[in-house]
Amino acid sequence: MTVTSDFTQKLYENFAENTKLRAVENAVTKNGLLSSLEVRGSHAANLPEFSLDLTKDPVTNQKQSGRCWMFAALNTFRHKFINEFKTEDFEFSQAYTFFWDKYEKSNWFMEQIIGDVAMDDRRLKFLLQTPQQDGGQWDMMVAIFDKYGIVPKAVYPESQASSSSRELNQYLNKLLRQDAEILRYTIEQDGDVQAVKEELLQEVFNFLAVTLGLPPQNFEFAFRNKDNEYKKFVGTPKEFYNEYVGIDLNNYVSVINAPTADKPYNKSYTVEFLGNVVGGKEVKHLNVEMDRFKKLAIAQMQAGETVWFGCDVGQESNRSAGLLTMDSYDFKSSLDIEFTQSKAGRLDYGESLMTHAMVLAGVDLDADGNSTKWKVENSWGKDAGQKGYFVASDEWMDEYTYQIVVRKDLLSEEELAAYEAKPQVLLPWDPMGALA
């Protein structure tokens, strides 16, 4: 239908007759939408106390960057380091992994560009839209750890560009789109593509070294623990990982909950074009039902390990209060609006996808062992939430959490076989390919 002036006039009249909406209009225009609709009772119902609580370590801060997936992964290692080596506080360098991820993503992008994707193919347009970005997924982080190791933050500290990455991304993507044209032209002219690509990668490396700083190949690091014991390390980043973390990351798998019709449960999935290290670990997910998803996360925490997880953090989120709940805001009583889409509907119609990775650091269980709320360690600094920690209600977890990483030995034989089977390849723009 065409929107006529008579129809619009009727809407005006309907609104004017609704005294409740006029009152809400005054509140919202003065105070903002969410501040006006906030439900105070949700605070009392989600107090930050948990029957299983794995850490109270100070939180980290990704600042103005999209490195949450790195922070979450390194935070899981960090808790292990602090506990085993009895340190007051400690951080691994998030800037170090950031450097190598940018470098590898640039090479990954170039490899896709010199493939056989036609210029008018939507997949090529997808690649060129964002040649690289800050975000990533767990398996991409594993690929970086496997190849480059890790270093302490004191050895490779933050730079302006790692803490605020907008300019870096703007000009690195500008460079990579130019490189894409150069590589395509070289192919058309039957030139030496690999030789040209190596020259272009040198430019990328130089750009990253200038903006982020040259990462160490060997280093020394010393510290004293709470017992005043002195420890010193001399070696490479990979040797440091092996000595001070020592986790075999091949023993961990990505588990998702994607209840859409195109993704049957108990099957594995990967996403076309998604990755960073050519020849590195493939991004791969096992899709399970939500009840099983939560039981796996609980089992890992009961074994003493925190859990890396990915979610849509902007949904029903009260950042200042540190709450992720379905009743944080009341649209129905105030605006006569209800949001009734299912999790599958939100995925299918573009309303939701994974936007952020954090750490599950605790859970509150009822008498039957079922979860009621979850302790979430964020990476937005101590001023967000409750000293950097958030509380997620169990219902919010059901609706807006999409991915966890758990030990393989927690899977059943059937689940492990499904994970290890050849994965179904999803389209590049599938929501399960979203980067945290």
Swiss-Prot record:
- Active site: residue positions: 68, 356, 378
Gene3D superfamilies per UniProt: Cysteine proteinases
Q: Which reaction does it catalyse?
A: Inactivates bleomycin B2 (a cytotoxic glycometallopeptide) by hydrolysis of a carboxyamide bond of beta-aminoalanine, but also shows general aminopeptidase activity. The specificity varies somewhat with source, but amino acid arylamides of Met, Leu and Ala are preferred
Q: What keywords is this UniProt entry annotated with?
A: Aminopeptidase, Hydrolase, Protease, Thiol protease
CDD domains of this UniProt entry? Answer: Peptidase_C1B
Q: Which GO terms describe its molecular function?
A: cysteine-type aminopeptidase activity; cysteine-type endopeptidase activity
Q: What does this protein do?
A: Hydrolyzes naphthylamide-substituted amino acids as well as di- and tripeptides in which the half-cystine residue is involved in a disulfide loop, notably in oxytocin and vasopressin. Also has a bleomycin hydrolase activity.
Q: How does it assemble?
A: Homohexamer.
- Which family does the record assign? Belongs to the peptidase C1 family.
Can you name this protein?
Aminopeptidase C
